[in-house]
C-alpha cells in the first residue's frame, strides 16, 4: 500500500510503535527485511500500536491524507484493555463508564480529524476474517474492507474518488 503513494510509511507495532518510510525505488524485499527486523524487538503487545499511532499523529500534528490499518480489528472497540489514564492532547480517550480503561479508537480518529486533518480517509482492512471492526461503518471518509489483495488499493482509491472527486 505504501509504495502506491507519493510518500508512504509502514508502522510496526507491539509494546512500542516504529514507523518506517517506504521508498518507491527501494526493493520490497529490503523494506520487508527492515520491518521484520524491527518486529523481532518491538514487543508482544497486539493492540497498543493503533493507539500510539493516533496519539503521535495528533500530538505531533502529522498530516496524513489516507491511513490504511491492516489489522484483525480487535483493538479499541470497547472490549479490549488499554493502559489506564490514556490521554491524547489533554483529553481522555477511554470508553466512559468502565472500571478498566478501554481505548476508544473512533474517538482518537475524530480527535485527529478535529485537531489535524478533517479530510483524512481511514481504510480499515480486516485481515483475520472476524466480523468486527475498529470503527462504525457509517463514519464519513472511513472504509471497511477485508482480505489480502492488490485490489484493496484500487477499491479504496475508487471509494475516495467517489467521495472527494478525482485526485489532481
Regions found by a protein language model. Give the residues of each.
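Acidic, glycine-rich A-domain
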Residues: 1-168
Amino acid at each position: 500500500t505504501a509504495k502506491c503513494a507519493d510518500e508512504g510509511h509502514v508502522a510496526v507495532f507491539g509494546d512500542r510503535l516504529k514507523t518506517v518510510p517506504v521508498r518507491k525505488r527501494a526493493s520490497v524485499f529490503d523494506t520487508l527485511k527492515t520491518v521484520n527486523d524491527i518486529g523481532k524487538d518491538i514487543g508482544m503487545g497486539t493492540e497498543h500500536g493503533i493507539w500510539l499511532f493516533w496519539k503521535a499523529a495528533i500530538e505531533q500534528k502529522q498530516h496524513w491524507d489516507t491511513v490504511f490499518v491492516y489489522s484483525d480489528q480487535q483493538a479499541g472497540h470497547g472490549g479490549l484493555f488499554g493502559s489506564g489514564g490514556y490521554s491524547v492532547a489533554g483529553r481522555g480517550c477511554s470508553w466512559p463508564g468502565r472500571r478498566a480503561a478501554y481505548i476508544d479508537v473512533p474517538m482518537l480518529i475524530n480527535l485527529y480529524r478535529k485537531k489535524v486533518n478533517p479530510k483524512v480517509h481511514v481504510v480499515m482492512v480486516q485481515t483475520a476474517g472476524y466480523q468486527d471492526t475498529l470503527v462504525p461503518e457509517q463514519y464519513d471518509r472511513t472504509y471497511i474492507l477485508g482480505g489480502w489483495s492488490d485490489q484493496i488499493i484500487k477499491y479504496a482509491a475508487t471509494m475516495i474518488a467517489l467521495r472527494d472527486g478525482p485526485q489532481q
